Design a protein with these regions (language model features):
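Hydrophobic/proline-rich hinge and linker segments of small-molecule sensing/allosteric domains
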Residues: 57-63, 133-156, 169, 240-245
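Extracytoplasmic small-molecule ligand-binding "clamshell" domains
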Residues: 23-123, 127-131, 185-189, 196-197
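Extended ligand-binding regions for polar small-molecule ligands
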Residues: 24-46, 82-91, 151-174, 178, ...
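Positively charged n-region of N-terminal signal peptides that target proteins for export
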Residues: 1-5
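Solvent-exposed coil/turn segments that connect beta secondary-structure elements
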Residues: 61-65, 103, 123-125, 149-152, ...
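Ligand-binding cleft/hinge of the Venus flytrap
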Residues: 69-73, 82-95, 135-137, 158-161, ...
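Bacterial N-terminal signal peptides
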Residues: 6-16
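A ligand-binding cleft/hinge motif common to bilobed small-molecule-binding domains
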Residues: 105, 109, 120-132, 197-233
Length: 260
């Protein structure tokens, strides 16, 4: 009886620590862009490494941001990231598998447990890393953008007056807001769409967000009512590959491809 009890505890613990315990979806990489392979010369060492590892498992985590990743299809991974990964797969002769986790911590745990080879971070991701990890050069670079309504004359790009400004709850640009609009009344929204709609309705005078997701949302929903009035050339954000520091060959290959 005691032996059975011990075995049941051990099995339960093993299951709780298994990869299946992660809140993870394996997605099909899907690209809608015409892919022409990059002329990417490989050393003999790199060719041998690729031959030994024909599959690259990439981890990501939610929430993703459109158009960097489209969230309409729960079975496939599409968007700017997917186009880039498809180009890399085609150029290097790799099969790329996407594993999407619910949280960043789950993705980091999967990387530490070797369930994935690398992580592709969020664009708003911080640059600081935990010990034992390396990061690649940036894939995408984004900048803060200031949006106003087309219905009214162009308002000032900086003022000490009280203005109303919208941004999303995960906004990373409060330092810029403080510099440009120190007396702004800021309202936070769950999405770019909701925040931008508040400028259309006149509830807010301005919106600040990154140029990629903001530009996509305006072109899709608000092209007749909103305009990007200014790009702030500071506080740029990136997304990067993250690898374990015991995978130097992978880290170097990813960096070389980004710079190709």
């Amino acid at each position: 009886m005691a032996v059975r009890l011990i075995l049941s505890v051990v099995v339960g613990l093993a299951l709780s620590l298994s990869p299946a315990a992660y809140a993870m979806k394996q997605l099909e990489l899907k690209s809608h862009s015409h892919i022409a392979a990059i002329d990417f010369p490989l050393s003999g060492k790199e060719k041998a490494w690729l031959a030994a590892q024909p599959t690259l498992t990439v981890g990501t985590w939610l929430p993703e941001r459109t158009p960097i990743v489209y969230d309409g299809d729960e079975k496939s991974y599409q968007g700017i990231n997917a186009d880039y990964l498809a180009l890399m797969a085609h150029s290097l002769g790799l099969k790329v598998i996407i594993r999407q986790y619910d949280t960043e911590q789950q993705a980091l745990t999967a990387l530490a447990d070797r369930q994935v080879d690398t992580l592709l971070t969020q664009v708003a991701h911080r640059d600081a890393l935990a010990p034992g990890l390396d990061q690649s050069a940036p894939l995408l670079k984004t900048w803060p953008t200031l949006v106003t309504s087309l219905k009214s004359p162009l308002p000032p790009l900086t003022t000490d007056r009280r203005v109303t400004l919208a941004c999303t709850r995960d906004c990373a640009f409060f330092d810029i807001i403080q510099q440009a609009f120190p007396n702004a009344k800021i309202t936070l929204y769950d999405s770019d769409y909701q925040a931008l709609a508040s400028v259309v309705s006149g509830e807010n005078q301005y919106f600040i967000g990154n140029n990629i997701t903001t530009g996509h949302c305006i072109s899709k929903y608000f092209s007749q009512s909103l305009v990007i009035a200014h790009y702030f050339r500071q506080q740029e954000q990136h997304n990067r590959f993250v690898t374990r520091d015991d995978r130097p060959e992978l880290h170097q290959l990813l960096d070389r491809f980004i710079h190709a």
